[in-house]
Regions:
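Generic long, charged, amphipathic alpha-helical segments
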Residues: 160-194
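Active-site oxyanion-binding pockets that recognize sulfate/phosphate
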Residues: 57-58, 82, 208
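Acidic/His metal-coordination segments adjacent to aromatic residues that form catalytic metal sites
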Residues: 36-59, 173-184, 238-246
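Short, contiguous acidic/charged loop-to-helix segments that flank catalytic cores in large enzymes
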Residues: 118, 136, 180-189, 202-210, ...
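Aromatic-rich carbohydrate-recognition surfaces in CAZymes
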Residues: 1-42, 60-64, 68, 188-206, ...
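Catalytic cores of carbohydrate-active enzymes
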Residues: 14-27, 32-33, 68-173, 216-217, ...
Length: 263
């Protein structure tokens, strides 16, 4: 790791700080900015011609949660390898301060999906600020996020990509390509998001037998799904509204992988 991987990781961090293509760069507050114009640089990437379904230009919540975890991991590695370089720790501290200042939305009791435009749309991306190993949030905020995601987005086999109370909510992934693209990240539930959700749920409720039983029960709909659609596998996406029919790829690797990981 020290010889082959660690130098590459240092180059990656350095490039994010300096900036690269698609308006990806570290701002003065330590947070990562990404995207501009018609570029779609997060996983919510639907674009048809000049139409962008979910523009998330700015500082996306999950990208900055991952950025913080990358910095904390680098600090652990530099300590292990005796580099005596505290720059990662210092930058992580700045990111943590900026993240709490910019992303917490008092009105919704959870995180903005993107800043600096302050997109208060309730989406599942914020779950990674809780589920990842290194957290920037206090326990009260973590619990509030998990409660909001459970109430608004959890549908059994996945998390909705958009709050059902939002005016742009499109829950059914069916019809023409245009209709499906409108729903893909605007109400459709995604199976792979269950992994982060279950991890976050266990984290905020404590690693107790009772929590494990509750988390296991949250996966009951997945067990039922394994007997339908593609037997023994998990679909890519599900309709946001009941009965939450499986859609998209009928056997999706990251849906399966994330459920196995958290199980």
């Amino acid at each position: 790791i020290k010889k082959d991987i660690y130098p590459c990781l240092k180059d990656i961090i350095s490039t994010y700080k300096k900036g690269t293509d698609f308006s990806i760069y570290m701002d003065t507050d330590g947070l990562i900015h990404a995207g501009s114009g018609l570029d779609q640089v997060t996983w919510m990437d639907v674009r048809v011609g000049d139409w962008v379904a979910t523009p998330r230009h700015g500082k996306p919540v999950e990208i900055n949660a991952l950025w913080y975890n990358a910095l904390c991991t680098m600090d652990m590695l530099q300590t292990k390898f005796g580099d005596n370089d505290d720059s990662y720790r210092q930058l992580a501290s700045l990111v943590k301060t900026s993240f709490n200042k910019r992303f917490w939305n008092e009105n919704t009791g959870c995180l903005y999906d993107v800043v600096d435009e302050d997109d208060d749309t309730i989406r599942p991306n914020q779950i990674y600020a809780v589920s990842l190993p290194f957290t920037m949030l206090d326990k009260e905020r973590e619990k509030a996020i998990v409660d909001t995601v459970t109430d608004k987005l959890y549908v059994g086999c996945g998390l909705r990509s958009l709050d059902p109370d939002h005016k742009d909510y499109h829950p059914i992934y069916i019809g023409s390509l245009s209709k499906r693209d409108h729903a893909y990240h605007q109400g459709t539930a995604w199976g792979f998001l269950l992994g982060g959700f279950i991890s976050a749920y266990v984290k905020v409720n404590g690693r107790t037998k009772e929590t494990a039983l509750c988390a296991d029960k949250l996966l009951d709909p997945v067990r039922e799904h394994l007997l339908n659609n593609c037997i023994g596998s998990i679909c890519e996406i599900f309709d946001g509204d009941a009965p939450h029919n499986g859609r998209g790829c009928y056997a999706q690797a990251w849906s399966v992988g994330e459920v196995l990981r958290c199980y």
